Amino acid sequence: MTEIPKEEYILKCTSACAGCSSSLILRYVLKAAGEDTVLVIPACCTSVIQGIYPNTAMNVPIYNVAFAAAAACASGMSEAFAKARKKTNVIVYAGDGGTVDI
């Protein structure tokens, strides 16, 4: 990728804390991955960033799962997309609590 895409997959006014680096990182991860992307989010602060239903701040499908289930969920989703011959990106994205604290 030589240029940053203009498309936004995180809408303005998320529920993130002011100056949250995790939401900024996720913004650019999604720009790199593109619109054909599914997020798997374990219980962590990232599930707060997305907002409260029905007012989500994400423009991609999101699956919230338990801490220990994120990798298995993403693996199963990737296999299902592969069997359907789809090249959908499946990304597990977690905040610091979902990554190293638990």
Per-range role (PLM):
Residues 1-102:
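Cofactor-binding active-site loop characterized by glycine-rich and histidine/acidic residues
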